[in-house]
Amino acid sequence: MALTKSRDYVSVKPATEAVTVEQARLHLDLDDNYYDSQLNQLIIVARQRVEQDSRRSLITQTRVMSMDAFPSDGIIELPTVPVQSVSSITYVDGNDATQTLSSSLYLVDSNNTPSRVVLNDGESWPNNRGHYDDVKVTYIAGYGDTVGDVDEVAKFAMLMLVSHLFNSPSVTSYGTMNIVPIGYELLIESLKWGQYP
């Protein structure tokens, strides 16, 4: 795939988390809700870490992939899975006007990993202005809207991190941020896809 520089970010955060505070409490064997506020924060941190390490979006969220130009081979590979849908593809034309590409020009293949946006036969990407972040693909990613939709391995990896962070506050000190619990990497290996440096 021929791609110019690209980046991907969350534009609309998940409305709910991939594991519940109740699940975290059960995993930690806590009897009351005294630590719920802390657990909520740790759940967010754990989800973000699992998503980063696995290149998967665990719960429904809106993401934006921005590129300097359309790929020369006609295929846009989205950097995270699973992809539910593509909301829009916009670009800045030669007159500095933002245009929305008609969805009739392309097909979204979300059945493969990575998910791809492919031009329909006979179509071509329009010319863009050629500046930084001129092309933006807005898409919905995640296993679904509820905890029950989320992959069980991903949920367990999150709970491992929540437990690790809760029971070892020192892991947030300088030089120890990359320490993860034993077994976490094995779970991530089963989830992640693509080439990693």
Predicted regions: what they are:
Residues 1-197:
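Divalent metal-cofactor coordination and adjacent catalytic microenvironments
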